[in-house]
Amino acid sequence: SKEYKKYAEQSKLELPAGKIVKDYLLRDFKLPEEKLEACAERICYLYDARRNRITMRPYLPETVEELHKIGIRQGIISNIISNTFVPEILKRYGIDRYMECVIMSSGTGIRKPNPKIFHIALRQLGLESKECAYVGDTISRDVIGAREAELGLMIQMHNPAIEHKDKAFLDSGYKPDMMINGFNELVPIIRRINGGGYQC
């Protein structure tokens, strides 16, 4: 719902699935709480599936595999209300085995750009922030979050489909280190700059 989206974006927090369903998505239906709890995850999954019409970007599997081959550890940080949506997508794309950590706001209660969600990923990987490069497609969540978490490198991937969401942040002062148009550009960049010792 727009109301929950506004709450989540302003607070940078994610509520538990049961609370999202009860207080926002199905609030007007006055259903028994125990029934809502029982189906909350499924409802959140369907909500995310409808809201996030996922299509795999070109070169994604090849890039993930090549980064793995050259010793780059990988993970994902996602703002999502379902606990099962992202793992299912990663499996569908055949890249789940390469992800050493999958950090979701649904599991942490924290949303990007809150730097704490980035710090959770760093702790799971046992790495320092300066050892990590981050690739994301928004200023509002990814660039700001990576900068606030003081990650070593921030690469923004151009995404025309969501550019309109970032208009309010263009003058925020937060900039990526570089822009790319697709995953096929990523491995050459990492090879070229990895004198910086990026591990992730």
In which residue ranges do the predicted regions lie?
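N-terminal helical cap/lid subdomain that shapes the substrate entry/recognition surface
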Residues: S1-P58, E65-K69, N83, M178
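Asp-based, Mg2+/Mn2+-dependent phosphohydrolase catalytic module
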Residues: P61, E65-H68, I77, I81-N83, ...
